[in-house]
A protein has these predicted regions:
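A glycine-rich dinucleotide-binding beta-alpha-beta segment and adjacent secondary-structure elements
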Residues: 86-166
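A conserved FAD-binding loop/helix module that cradles the flavin
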Residues: 165-191
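Ser/Thr-centric signal marking residues that sit
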Residues: 14, 125, 134, 169, ...
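Predominant activation on well-ordered alpha-helical scaffold segments within soluble catalytic domains
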Residues: 23, 27, 86, 109-112, ...
Length: 191
């Protein structure tokens, strides 16, 4: 089954892969898909989301005119971080040492296509020890909503990430932990 999501955010390219707010938000769904499908997931990243294809093509053309005597690797220095350029050129099947003034219109179009859809293969998630948020835990069906007391065990209360709830990044999970902790603690104190 195909699954897609159009989201806009800042991504972070790290030594182990991609990270950042949107990656963290997608990680629960991606982890479930990886587990269910037993196959890698292809992520397409628009490296220039503020520009339409046509505007990006014009921008690349201007840069290529400015750096016409440079190698392709150096002719893209104003467009991308230096360490990302070889990755993009590799996906566009372009030689980084090729002079910019020898890039054909078709090659330039292929480059823009990669800039608008860099393909990254997701092979897994980071280990639990590195998790910022975890999914899973005690089902909310087994918990009294106002007191956070167990419906199955008298005197047992739950709070935070032991409960099967999780939210997007941005403090929602911390707020859930604080609020459920307060509610469970207050209820337990008055038991």
């Amino acid at each position: 089954r195909d699954w897609s999501s159009d989201v806009c955010s800042s991504d972070l390219f790290t030594h182990f892969g991609v990270s950042g707010p949107i990656i963290l938000s997608l990680s629960k769904t991606v982890a479930a898909l990886l587990k269910a499908n037993k196959t890698n997931i292809d992520l397409l990243i628009d490296l220039k989301p503020a520009l339409t294809f046509e505007k990006l093509e014009a921008r690349v053309q201007r840069d290529f005119e400015q750096y016409s005597r440079k190698q392709l690797l150096n002719g893209m220095k104003d467009l991308l971080p230096q360490r990302l350029i070889p990755v993009v050129l590799d996906q566009a099947y372009l030689d980084e040492e090729k002079p910019v003034n020898q890039i054909s219109k078709e090659e330039r179009k292929r480059l823009v296509e990669v800039l608008k859809g860099l393909s990254v293969s997701i092979t897994g998630t980071r280990p639990l020890a590195e998790a910022i948020v975890t999914a899973g835990g005690v089902s909310i069906k087994e918990i009294e909503p106002k007191t956070l007391r167990s419906k199955l065990w008298q005197g047992l209360y739950f709070a935070g990430e032991v409960i099967d709830i999780d939210g997007y990044t941005g403090g929602y999970n911390l707020q859930a932990a604080f609020s459920t902790g307060y509610a469970a603690g207050t209820a337990a104190a008055y038991q």
